[in-house]
Amino acid sequence: MSPSGFYAWRTRPESARTQEDRRLKVLMHASFTGGRGYYGSPRIQDDFLEWGEHVSRKRIIRLMQEEGLQARVRKRYKVTTDSDHDQPIADNLLQQDFTADRPNQRWVGDTSELRIGENGKAYLAVILDLYSRFVVGWAISAVNDRHLTIKALEMALKRRCPGLGLLHHSDQGSTYASEDYQDVLAAYGITCSMSRRGNCYDNAVMEAFFSTVKSEIGEWFASHGDAKAELFDYIEVFYNQRRRHSAAGRMSPAAYERRLTHAA
């Protein structure tokens, strides 16, 4: 190429598509950053639509590749269920129907193990509302016992004040089957449902939640204090209020529930 030709190539105006790509990349980075680096093309596209930008998934994928943006891969969580006990086991009333017509109709709960420091452990108990996937209750402790799960349940009850007709589903673990835990459920008129023994699909929503948590913020923390602080920020500030969820109409759990309130 001649010097004049090279100069002409270097100084020619950008095409309209190149200019548009550059503009979209700014928005894409805003979405990716707002999603704390957890968003892939589907949720970035949701942000674009909310901002009035109609961009194909294929184009977003291309732009993400050009910018080196990649969402984190989901991990499986470590099972902590202790089903070897003599407590009564409730029937599986949920039957893998993870839908709900309104808040406080169906809750699911489970516990997962976290790593603390070099050799330590902690346990995170969570209760989700199946209507919106809102985390209604959670607690963290160095000991996986009934006090941990009851603490998460008490947070959920205080936060939501559910009426009659609520179904609570969990695995058959001793912390959920314990007399103390069952007494709290009974006191609030909550019906208990439990997964079949060893069947993770009966509580698949909770498995998916913990996998999301561990892929997005990890499962190792320097201390119990750090774990509690990071989980508070992730659950209360990000997950419930901002993180888009496919089961909540691609909205955040809080936004999905506000939609119901406005409709009423």
What are these regions (language model features)?
Residues 1-264:
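Charged DNA-binding/catalytic regions of mobile-element recombinases
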